Each structure stands twice: as structure tokens, then as C-alpha cells.
């Protein structure tokens, strides 16, 4: 059983959803980012998505675009990101960690080398937003052969004809992008979320995690009543952008994470 399967099985037994947190590796700098990463599980993150910095994050809104700029300014490349995972894993063997981003940095690093190094570092899965299922043989299949989960994104515009293609080969969980647009955009209505989850469950037994637009503990709780996971990224990254010091960034992110975790954990009581 993979770490992701294990975590979602534990949460199902506890009758609660996962809090899935997204931060960009190296934002605002390596040391601060590593401190945030190490602190997230204790602050209540059940699954961590770690962004791989890229110069052209086209699916991301202003908050995550700026996070990428800050990380790249600090010379955060793929090697540094994988080293960060190794350092995280040295103290945490249980929290699933998924690398999220775009295909270009993986391609430049070398696909075989990336899969091997990611697995060795302790990565559990991948979300590659710009690699469609028609290209499964390029990364999805080799990654899964190596024991990495490959998590697909579905959107409000993914119709019933397209869904089986998107979900074929998916593992770990399904990431439902609840708003058509860029990350950090407005939140979806709860009725829409409910309908989307019901539709996805007709096509897959994988846990469904909802992302894009969740900013408050209250909203995270409402999503957690309806899906297996609530994904929060831009709201956490805003805390880094607003911080006047590294310690303030750490405290801001972990403080909000605790509040979100409280919302998610109390949702089904």
C-alpha cells in the first residue's frame, strides 16, 4: 500500500477528509521553505503538494506565479527541490508528498533520472498539469512502474466522454479543479462541488480532492463534508508574500494551516 493509499484509508476509518496543502519549493528561500515543509504535518496537513518552480506556470494565478519568481530568484531548481524532499523525509516517513508542476522542468532534468531521483528522495506521487493522458507513455506509465502515483486533474469542462480517458492510469487521488481558470480564483458553489463529486464517483473509486478557490477554514470544512480532501494553496502562499521576515512567513503559513485543519477535522462531526 502506498503512502497516499494508506493515508486516505486512515482518514476514511476516522470519517474525515484530508487537508491537502500546496506550497512552492524554495519560496521565499530554501531554508524558510524547508522549515515550512517540515512544520506542515504537525500543523495538520494530511497530504503535501510541493510545487516544482517553473518560469511559465500558465495554470497558476498571481500568488503562485510570484511564488515561482521568488523561488527561482533563490536558484531553486529540480536538484534543490529533490534535496528538500530528502531532508523532509529524514524526519517524516508517514506524510504523503506529491510533486506538482509542469512537464518542462522534468523533461530538462531527464525523465528517467527524475523518476529515479524522485523515488529515492521519498516522493509519493506526481501532478503534471500540462501533460495530457494522450502522453501517458512519456511520464505517467514509467512513473507508476517505479511506484509513484500519477494524479490527474479534472475540471468543470471535463465531460463524461472525456473522463474515462483522463482517469485511465490515474492513481493516488483525483484532483478536481472546481473553478475553470487559474489557481487562487473565486471559489466554486457548494452545489457545483456536490454534483462534480457525484459525477466523478460514477467513474472512479479513487478519493476526490477539491482545489482552487479554498481560502478559509469554513470553506475548507464545507468541501470536506462533500469530498475526500480539500486542497489549499494560494491562501497559504499569500502568507509568505505578506511576511516581513522568514519567521513571519513560517508562522503565517503554519498558523493558517492549523485553522484550516481544525475546519476540515470538525466538518463531519
Curated annotation (Swiss-Prot):
The active site is at 49 (proton acceptor), 60 (proton acceptor). GO terms for cellular component: cytosol. One of its GO terms (molecular function) is tryptophan synthase activity. CDD domains: Tryptophan_synthase_alpha (cd04724). It catalyses: (1S,2R)-1-C-(indol-3-yl)glycerol 3-phosphate + L-serine = D-glyceraldehyde 3-phosphate + L-tryptophan + H2O. The keyword Lyase applies. Keywords: Amino-acid biosynthesis, Aromatic amino acid biosynthesis, Lyase, Tryptophan biosynthesis. Tetramer of two alpha and two beta chains. Belongs to the TrpA family. This is Tryptophan synthase alpha chain. It comes from Ectopseudomonas mendocina (strain ymp). The gene is trpA.
Amino acid at each position: 500500500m502506498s503512502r497516499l493509499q494508506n493515508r486516505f484509508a486512515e482518514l476514511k476509518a476516522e470519517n474525515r477528509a484530508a487537508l491537502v496543502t500546496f506550497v512552492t519549493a524554495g519560496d521565499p528561500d530554501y531554508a524558510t521553505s524547508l522549515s515550512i515543509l517540515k512544520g506542515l504535518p504537525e500543523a495538520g496537513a494530511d497530504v503535501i503538494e510541493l510545487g516544482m518552480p517553473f518560469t511559465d506556470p500558465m495554470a497558476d494565478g498571481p500568488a503562485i506565479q510570484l511564488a515561482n519568481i521568488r523561488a527561482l530568484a533563490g536558484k531553486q531548481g529540480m536538484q534543490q527541490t529533490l534535496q528538500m524532499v530528502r531532508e523532509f523525509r529524514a524526519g517524516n516517513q508517514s506524510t504523503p508528498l506529491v510533486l506538482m508542476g509542469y512537464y518542462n522542468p522534468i523533461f530538462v532534468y531527464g525523465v528517467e533520472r527524475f523518476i529515479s531521483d524522485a523515488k529515492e528522495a521519498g516522493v509519493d506521487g506526481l501532478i503534471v498539469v500540462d501533460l495530457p493522458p494522450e502522453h501517458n507513455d512519456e511520464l505517467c506509465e514509467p512513473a507508476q512502474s517505479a511506484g509513484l502515483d500519477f494524479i490527474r486533474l479534472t475540471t468543470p469542462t471535463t465531460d463524461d466522454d472525456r473522463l474515462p480517458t483522463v482517469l485511465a492510469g490515474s492513481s493516488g487521488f483525483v484532483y478536481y479543479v472546481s473553478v475553470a481558470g487559474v489557481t487562487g480564483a473565486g471559489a466554486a458553489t457548494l452545489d457545483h462541488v456536490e454534483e462534480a463529486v457525484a459525477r466523478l464517483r460514477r467513474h472512479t473509486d479513487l478519493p476526490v480532492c477539491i482545489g482552487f478557490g479554498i481560502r478559509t477554514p469554513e470553506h475548507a470544512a464545507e468541501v470536506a463534508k462533500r469530498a475526500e480532501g480539500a486542497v489549499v494553496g494560494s491562501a497559504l502562499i499569500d502568507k509568505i508574500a505578506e511576511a516581513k521576515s522568514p519567521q513571519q512567513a513560517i508562522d503565517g503559513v503554519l498558523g493558517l494551516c492549523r485553522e484550516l485543519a481544525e475546519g476540515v477535522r470538525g466538518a463531519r462531526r
